[in-house]
Amino acid sequence: YCEENLCGQYGVNYSCPPDCGTPDQMKQKVLAHKKALVVSTEWEIEDFSQTDKLKEAKSLHNAAMLRMIKKLKADGHDGFMIGASGCSLCKPCKLANGESCEHPDMMYSCMAAYCIWVKKLAEDCNMNYDYKDKILPFFGMYVFD
């Protein structure tokens, strides 16, 4: 999926392939931890042609995840985030200018970069995945011990 570059971030964002790691490296990163908190937020989106609204919803979802994770880390639950999209802490990503990542401890990759099939994950967690009644869910995870 990532190599299709539908989001435009392949090779230009540290959090995205090929820079974030191989599929096996990403899988091992998750499997090295014992727990995962799966989080879903729901957004009213009239239709998928509203790309600005979709981007804003993903951004707000990821921002909410980062706020939650800050609290979890403060309580001693060290881990990492998997977002609804690739990292957007710096716009553009420092990779575009050949600079080092400014936030390596906060950078997050998307579910696709981890080869996570979100529909199956949602079903396994008994969570709604489907877009219906103009409500679109976004998913994220916090992986920790």
Where are the regions that the model predicts?
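Catalytic cores of enzyme domains
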Residues: Y1-N13, P17-D145
